[in-house]
């Protein structure tokens, strides 16, 4: 499984108690993403990581990487952020989030006007980012869940690194090696060759 711990608990409710105790130690920030289709470019940048005091942490203008013609002439912009439970943004719809983000969009492009927006969608995920606290290493679940043949590889396990595609690939390779070793061990016990 590659799901956040909170989803893993819902999908596999019969996990051993010791394992679920480890899963439950991790707290998450929500990931949010406002996706906009614009009738014109917002900027000439593909990816902006935002460290300023704006209401989002990344602005990815996908159509500065792929041609707008591949998206019906639309300019696709992703605005992502993290939010703690209880953040008012989590209760907003796409139009409300757009209104909240508009001052930040005007920092990127002072000419930006909400009339440029053809459509907007707002997505949120409660398992967006593990919160790394003191003694976090005690909260990292092992890959083997305690249920034969069921393994977990998710962002809680990339510590001390930060989550990212490269680390996800490394986790996948580690778990694949573990599964291969486990399958070989089971086969050996049964007298089979692998």
Description of each model-found segment:
Residues 66-72, 124-159:
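FAD-binding beta-loop-beta segment adjacent to the flavin cofactor pocket
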Residues 9-13, 132, 162-163:
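Short glycine-/acidic-enriched loop or helix-start segments at secondary-structure transitions
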Residues 107-117, 181-189:
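Surface-exposed helix-capping loop/turn segments at secondary-structure junctions
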Residues 94-97, 168:
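Hydrophobic (often cysteine-bearing) scaffold residues that line and stabilize catalytic clefts
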Residues 101-104, 175:
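Alpha-helical packing segments of well-folded alpha/beta enzyme cores
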Residues 28-31, 109-125:
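A short coil-to-beta-strand element that immediately follows conserved catalytic motifs
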Residues 154-183:
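A conserved FAD-binding loop/helix module that cradles the flavin
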Residues 1-91, 95, 103-108, 141, ...:
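Mid-domain catalytic core of redox enzymes
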């Amino acid at each position: 499984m590659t799901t956040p711990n909170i989803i893993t608990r819902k999908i596999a409710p019969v996990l051993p108690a010791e394992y679920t105790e480890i899963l439950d130690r991790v707290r998450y920030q929500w990931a949010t993403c406002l996706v906009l289709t614009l009738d014109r470019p917002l900027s000439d940048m593909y990816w902006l990581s935002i460290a300023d005091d704006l209401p989002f942490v990344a602005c990815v203008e996908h159509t500065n990487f792929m041609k707008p013609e591949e998206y019906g002439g639309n300019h696709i912009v992703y605005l992502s952020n993290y939010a703690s439970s209880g953040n008012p943004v989590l209760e907003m719809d796409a139009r409300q989030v757009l209104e909240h983000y508009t001052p930040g969009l005007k920092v990127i492009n002072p000419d930006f006007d909400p009339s440029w927006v053809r459509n907007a969608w707002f997505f949120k995920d409660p398992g967006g980012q593990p919160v790394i606290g003191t003694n976090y290493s005690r909260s990292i679940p092992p890959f083997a869940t305690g249920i034969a043949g069921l393994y977990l590889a998710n962002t809680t396990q990339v510590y001390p690194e930060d989550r990212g595609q490269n680390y996800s690939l490394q986790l996948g390779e580690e778990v694949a090696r573990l599964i291969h070793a486990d399958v070989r061990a089971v086969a050996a016990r049964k007298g089979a060759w692998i």
